[in-house]
Amino acid sequence: PKQGENFEPSPGFHEGNAWNYTFFVPHDIKGLTKLMGGNKKFVDKLQSVFDRGNYAPTNEPNIAYPYLFSRFKGEEWRTQKLIKELLAKHFTNQPAGIPGNDDTGTMSTWAIFSMMGLYPDCPGVPEYTLTTPTFDEIEVKLDPKYWGKDKLVIKKEGKGDYIKEIKLDGKKYGKYLITHEDLINAGEITFVTMDR
């Protein structure tokens, strides 16, 4: 914790390195994409984080990185593939079943959101990036006094790992980002899945 204090030499990063922090600009992915030279260069560099083994699922700075692919049309499948692989590899039902320190529930929360098929990848922005849920049906109890409804239902149709279609209350929804308000007002979100 005292590294870099009193002008001591420091690597410039805490609990990570340049790979872990390069894409940590959740509030301005569009600006970062432009800075990197466009969509293809951004996606290629992001994919290299995973291909080279530089993704660190044990710490917060880059835990949202798998979800960034869904910001680019046609690349959403990468998010869906990575989330399934990361859940299987790093989260088990054993005493040490989470990667690293849970840091006040951060890693457990990442796993729960990911299993539900949605993740709030930008702190302070009330929206979620969508991915394939783990379970066939999830029912989230809501207090109707605050939400106007008593539940949010998340359904997965089919046995595939990839999303073919997303529906809100039975109507086609063509995006992989959803606002908190739209999600709660919908009452039901259905992920129709397929094999790649």
Task: Give the predicted meaning of each segment.
Residues 147-152, 173-174:
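Short, isolated positions in well-ordered beta-strands
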Residues 1-148, 181, 187-190:
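Active-site core of glycosidic bond-cleaving carbohydrate-active enzymes
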Residues 157-196:
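C-terminal beta-sandwich/jelly-roll accessory domains of carbohydrate-active enzymes
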Residues 142, 152-158:
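Beta-strand-rich recognition domains
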